[in-house]
């Protein structure tokens, strides 16, 4: 049993498993990407490596799905304009 777990873990490491996440896009000033239409957000999300993006109208912000882990999707401080 332990051998099977070891082999499975090694296969995952060797294949380069990539984790994906969903969230709002933030710029370098900790501000969300503002939007008015889905096309803009789709373009921005894809440029960051995401699968899909849309304008979440309630917050007027771009929401992305399938982003790489390295992309900032959480606010880390105050938005400075």
UniProtKB/Swiss-Prot annotation:
Instruction: Provide the alphabetized UniProt keywords.
Output: Disulfide bond, Ion channel impairing toxin, Neurotoxin, Secreted, Signal, Toxin, Voltage-gated sodium channel impairing toxin
Where it sits in the cell: the answer is: Secreted
Q: What does the entry state regarding organ or tissue expression? A: Expressed by the venom gland.
Which GO annotations describe the biological process of this protein? defense response
Q: Which residues form the signal peptide?
A: 1-19
Give the matching PROSITE patterns.
LCN_CSAB (PS51863)
Q: Cite a single GO MF annotation.
A: sodium channel inhibitor activity
- Gene3D superfamilies per UniProt: Knottin, scorpion toxin-like
Spell out the InterPro entries in the cross-references. Answer: LCN-type_CS_alpha_beta_dom, Scorpion_toxin-like, Scorpion_toxin-like_sf, Scorpion_toxinL, Scorpion_toxinL/defensin
LCN-type CS-alpha/beta domain spans which residues?
21-80
One annotated Gene Ontology cellular component of this protein: extracellular region
What single Pfam family name could you report for this chain, choosing any that match? Toxin_3
Record-annotated disulphide pairs: 31-79, 35-55, 41-62, 45-64
What family does the entry list? Belongs to the long (4 C-C) scorpion toxin superfamily. Sodium channel inhibitor family. Alpha subfamily.
Summarize the protein's role.
Answer: Binds voltage-independently at site-3 of voltage-gated sodium channels (Nav) and inhibits the inactivation of the activated channels, thereby blocking neuronal transmission.
UniProt comment concerning the protein's domains: Has the structural arrangement of an alpha-helix connected to antiparallel beta-sheets by disulfide bonds (CS-alpha/beta).
User: In its UniProt entry, what is this protein called?
Assistant: Neurotoxin LmNaTx15.1
Q: Which classification does the entry list for the species? A: Eukaryota, Metazoa, Ecdysozoa, Arthropoda, Chelicerata
